[in-house]
Structures are given as C-alpha cells and as structure tokens.
C-alpha cells in the first residue's frame, strides 16, 4: 500500500482526478458543439488552460493563488482572442475552408477584446507585484520592476499579430 507524506494527499489526488475528468469532458463538449459558439469558444479554450493550472498546482500540493488564477484567465483569454484575430488576418485575400465560428467574429471586436484582456492581465500582474501578501512572501517590494517586461511581452505579441501576421 502506498503511503503519503501529507494527510491531505488523497484529497489532493481526488481533486486532480476531478479536474482532469472535467478537462476531458470540456474538450469533448468543445469538439462536438461549443467550438461553433462565438465568444464561448475562446472561453472554453481558456477554461481548459485554467483547469491545467489548477491540476498542476494541486498536483504538487499547493493551493493556486487568486493572483495566479486572475492573471492566468486574462492571459489565456488574451491569447485566445488574439489567435482568432490571427485566423481572420490569414483569411484576408484567401478563400477556402476555415472555422465556421470565424464568420461571426469581427476584426474590430477582436481588437477590443484583446485590448481588454491585455489590460486586465497587465493590471492584475501589476497589483500582484505590490500586494502585501506578495511582498511578504518574497521579502521584497521590488517585483514591481518586472512589470515593464510583462508589458513589453504583451505589446510585442500585439505587434507581431498586427504587423507581421503572427499570432
């Protein structure tokens, strides 16, 4: 019989199993129907990433912070909407088959959604770096100096999306 070093290890294992099961069901639902519903398609993809974050943190025996969840959600939504924008960019001047849901997206809407999500990720991360909990945990208030790198990374991604056809 396997012995666990933590009394809560079994409950953690069950939580990870439940999350992995939810992830599988979510992917099946996405493949069968949800990928055809505008906006919800990206939220489902982001939910899959969030479930992976939860499974990973619980799997190693730590509770996910609300900052990790907030920043993770905003970043995965940002990337999801940016990906849809890149797919629309690729369709310009090229016919052919594509995701049916793209017919329901508008470039301006996607630009606004990526901007909102990028702003949310930047604000969330910035607030994380100065929160009392974070300063106490890391023993420094200097994490605020990492914010420009996060902003640059997001801006660079947007530049590549809009000027280089990336995404």
Q: Which sequence ranges carry the predicted segments?
A:
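Short, small-residue-biased leader/transition segments that mark boundaries at the very start
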Residues: 3-11
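Structural signature of hydrophobic alpha-helical transmembrane segments
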Residues: 10-21, 147-149
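Internal transmembrane alpha-helices of multipass membrane proteins
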Residues: 19-30
